[in-house]
Amino acid sequence: MSSIKEKFNQISPSEFFYSNRDLAGFSNPTRSLYTAVREFVENALDACDQKGILPDVHLTIKAVDPEKSDPKPYILTVKDNGPGIDAEHIPLAFGTVLYGSKFGLKQARGMFGLGATMAILYGQITTNKPVTVKSCADGQTQNQFEILLDIQKNKPVIVKHITKDAAKKGLSVSICLEGDYSKAGNKIRDYVYETSLITPYASITFDDPKGQKFSHPRFVKDIPPPPTIIRPHPHGIDVERIRRMIVESQFEIPTIDDAMIEKVRKDLGLSVKKLSFTSIMEKAKKKWKTLPRQVRVVIALMSFLKMDFEKLNKIRIEDIDMPNKKLFYWDFGDSQSKSIDMDPESQYYKQLTNTVQGEPLTTFLTKRFQRVGPTTALKFAAFAKLKPEKRMGTLTNQELVNLSDALQKFDDFMAPDSSCLAPLGAEPLEKGIKKFFNPDFVAVVQRPASAYSGFPFIIEMGIAYGGDIKSGGPHVYRYANRIPLLYDEGSDVVIKVVNDTDWGRYKVKGEPPFIIVSHICSTRIPYKTAGKENVADRQEIERELRLALQYLSRKLSSFMSKRGQAEMAKKRANLYAKYIPMIAEFCTELSGKKKEPNYKKMLETEIAFETKKAVKEENEIGNK
């Protein structure tokens, strides 16, 4: 029997998402049009937020052939007044999957580095049209690109590039894609509407394919401070991340070529071309403290090789084997590999140790992680049963696993730093709810910062009742890092918390007119999918959501009680006005008298009292 050999292939990130675009929210023309809108609008808002610019975002969707039935090609354009993108970055930013500026540990709407590029990829595979990018980053020159994406190579193909004069900074992105606006229209309008609620400092305009304009001007002029990039927290680290951090902490052995030798000569202040090995080392010893690290490494290598500059230029360093104290190099003159023994007692041995074996454990902890000081680092070393001076580059695979496990279990690390987060704020959130819903009652809360798996997060929540709110509540508006989440609500942690609440306990019955607005901001939102539509039910996040909702529900319960008391006062006043005259008449007849008692003054006093009480209750409710 003949055997069939398996064929192994490697595919690029763009080819993977081309075959699995459902993962990023591009499953059908309806969802894809909505997702593309989201990605470009969020990129525009993120760019403005990072530079402290009050955003002006203009969204346009135009049918290529208005007479054709859906699904059909649409031209989607998003224009902003942000900082723009430098010309050299545009091709990679819009023509490469998993390339971008959002991979640092900071709060941002985008986090996977593929959303906008996936929209461009979807447009290309459904209409075969390039993306058009117009960017002005200096306020003077606009660079206009037409770009296609080479799916197999995950590289951009520049179809066209022109420049022209411009008067202001900003970015415009336009793609042609297959969509179904007849089905996606409601979601897109809801998205723009809800984005305006959670970003009251932004002005967003939407021109739809039917010629309608939806304008949402800003009503808050104070923009929240931009989020900042932070170092990771020890509780949010795994083995692979530690391994990468160790590599980053290690200093590469410099290439010893003519340029490096000239740099060493310059830093040592050597004017004489030919100096002996001894003269060079004496000069280096005097200037050691002022020499940069690269030069120190070269001097350390020279000390063991016993070579001057002329001989040093004829070799290449191959390896530094610290455990065996050997230095390997290639001799171009003899065309062979050679090795020498290194003296561990030499003053230069430590320099090479630092270069090859990395930082000591305590230095690694204090320099690479947030909120870890020398005292905590020493305590952790004892907890992990590692020597504080242990070099990170000497850890075995098992020691790395043990280190990762110890980082997760050590309880004396401080809580993650939340100063990097940029929540919307209770006051802007309340203003947004009042503007959009005109409620009879509104209450908001911003919970103290908390953390899950080493990632800080803050919960903001608002609750509103009555006014322009439709019945059938609670209506839940979910946000994460100021992104409206409109799909897949059934599996979201916020919906879980709302559904678990016994609303009858808070005097809310039937299908009342009330809403809940929930906002989670974090350096790492635990989305369930790359489509960023629902948040996983992490225990810490669920707890904070519950506490926020319970606090607001008690406020709502108090409002409902006082509202009930006010209504009862009005009812009592109406009852007095209706029945006291009748009682007076019956009493007069029963007593055989002709003149009725003077009940009007008493009635006026009682009605005035009940009315005053009702007004007082309503005023108290209105002031909440």
What do the predicted segments below correspond to?
Residues M1-D56, E88-L92, I223-P225, I230-I237:
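Bergerat-fold GHKL ATPase/HATPase_c domain
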Residues Q152-P156, G179-Y201, K210-E252, T363, ...:
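Charged regulatory segments coupled to nucleotide-binding catalytic modules in large multidomain enzymes
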Residues G84-D86:
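A short glycine-centered beta->alpha linker in the GHKL/HATPase_c
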Residues Y74-I75, G100-G236, Q336, L386-L403, ...:
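GHKL-type ATPase core
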Residues D258, K314-L352:
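Conserved tyrosine-mediated DNA breakage-rejoining catalytic core shared by Y-recombinases
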Residues P66-T77:
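Short, highly conserved beta-strand within the GHKL-type HATPase_c fold
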Residues D80:
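Acidic ATP/Mg2+-coordinating residue in the GHKL
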